[in-house]
Amino acid sequence: MTDTVQLAKKYFELSNKGKLTEIKKLFTSSSTYSSANKDIFLGSDQIMDMQTKFFSGFDTLGWNVHNIKEVKPGIVLFDFTFTGITLDGEVVQRSGKEYVIVYNGKIQHVEVSNKD
């Protein structure tokens, strides 16, 4: 397993544990994050503000990763299913694809899209 895949997997593992402080260390001030369900964010501060708000809307949440593949050097593709229970008790489930781009040992970009 390449260092790129290991770092990308670590990002998902930390997300499933809700370890936002540790997740922030994986990004830089020039990292970007784009999601079909959100917006686009620049830098670890903006990314983590978004993630903090996202996580705070759920009692429980997690990503079940079905497939991981380094599609090109430095680019890892995850197929996943997200499941969460909101603070109102609503069950949210969606399948998606997530590209994690790693450069110089940090996450440079995350691109999340719905599978449909």
PLM regions with names:
Residues L7, K17-S30:
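Short, well-ordered alpha-helical segments enriched in acidic and aromatic residues
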Residues N37-I40:
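Short histidine/acidic/glycine/proline-rich micro-motifs that form metal-
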Residues D3, S34, M48-D116:
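A beta-strand edge to alpha-helix "cap/lid" segment located at domain peripheries
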Residues L42-Q46:
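Short beta-edge strand/loop motif at the mouth of beta-sheet-based domains
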Residues L14-S15, G57:
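Histidine kinase transmitter module recognition
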Residues K9-E13:
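Amphipathic alpha-helical repeat scaffolds
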